[in-house]
Amino acid sequence: MSGRQGGKAKPLKAPKKGEKDLSEEDVEFKKKQQEEAKKIKEMAAKAGQRGPLLGGGIKKSGKK
């Protein structure tokens, strides 16, 4: 006997999930989420164009 034969065998394909009945609230919520994700993505792209906010790195105090 090999070690892999024990237990329940996995099915080759997962069963397809049926269509969900979405209410108007669910549709609105999904639409709102997509719009927010789009805004966040645009803001991230816009922020990436400017470069780093801090440009000094480690600052030396000047004391010896």
From Swiss-Prot:
Residues 1-64 are annotated as: Disordered. The keyword Coiled coil applies. InterPro entries: TMA7 (IPR015157). The keyword Coiled coil applies. Residues 53-64 have a biased composition (Gly residues). Residues 21-50 form a coiled coil. It comes from the Eukaryota. Keywords: Coiled coil. Residues 28-44 have a biased composition (Basic and acidic residues). Pfam families: TMA7. Disulfide bonds: none annotated. Belongs to the TMA7 family. This is Translation machinery-associated protein 7 homolog. The lineage of its organism: Eukaryota, Metazoa, Ecdysozoa, Nematoda, Chromadorea.
